[in-house]
Every structure is written in C-alpha cells, then in structure tokens.
C-alpha cells in the first residue's frame, strides 16, 4: 500500500511570520510533523509543499522530498485542497494521501498510525482529526447572538461536539481534487487534547 503524507508549510503567515521555522523547544515547528510522517510505519513517502528556502533545507536534511509551491498557491486566499492536489506526485499510484499540518507539533506518531489503521480498516474515504469539545457555545442568526444548546448543562453531560484540529486529514487518493479532500464515507478520529495544541 502506498501512502503519501503532504505537509504544507509556506513562508507567509498573517498570524505569526515565519511560524514554520520558528523554534519550538529545540527544533523548528515544521520538524515535528516531518518527524512523525517519517517515523510512521504506514507512510511510504513524505513531501513538503513550500515556497520557503529554510523549510526546503530542513525537509531535505531530514530526508523528506520537497515540492516547490508556485506563488499563486502560496497566498492567504488559496485553499489547502488546491495545495495538496498540486503536491501529489504521479510517480506512484497512491492509496491514501494524508495532509499533516506543521501547527500540530504535539501529535504523536502512535496516534497518527492508529488513525491510519482505523481509516484503512473502516474503508473510509476521509478521516479527520478532532477533539471532543462540548462547550456552551453561541452562534449568530440574523445579527443576534443565540445559544447553540437547548439547556445549560455541565460539560460532562453535554452531547459530544467534535472540533477539527488540523493535525491530519487522511483521504483516499482517488477522491482528492483541487476543490476537496473530503469523500462521502467520512469520520472523525478523536485525539487527546494535549496532542491538538495549535
């Protein structure tokens, strides 16, 4: 089985400039997702999609491949779907493509591999990392703030509410297009909150 991990790590960031190469502990942020992908017992190839020379150097030093991202795919308005689709190499027939964000440095390779096993065993089109975060949240309708709950309850009594973490999106390769990585048969994979730090 051929499983490709793609790590999108562009140079620009509105929130934190050069965030992917900033040190977190002893290593640049992007190091952690590359390390997990390379250490996975299921991922066969790792590609970093970047327009950053420092990220390119880090990736190559670690043994990952680099896909140089064109300027038109490095802007703030570009969807991740288009970036991932652009980075998929055609030198192999891929079974799965995994998007791994550098902004989830606390994810463990054990959790990643368990999720891959679950996606394959369950024959899912897409598996998305998430945390269970049942909070008393509010939304907006017609300009008014309204509660997203019917009754105020303690957190442990609230129904599950899963929030995507961005740590990974595991997709069957044949459903990945320029506009989506989400198929019909979709599930979320609950990861520990400590592994969802962004």
Show which residues each predicted segment covers.
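Short, high-confidence coil segments that cap the C-terminus of an alpha-helix
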Residues: 43, 92-94, 123-124
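Extended, histidine- and acidic-residue-enriched regions that form the cofactor-binding/catalytic faces
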Residues: 93, 194-197
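Active-site acidic Asp-centered loop
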Residues: 100-102
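Short beta-strand scaffold positions
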Residues: 49-50, 170
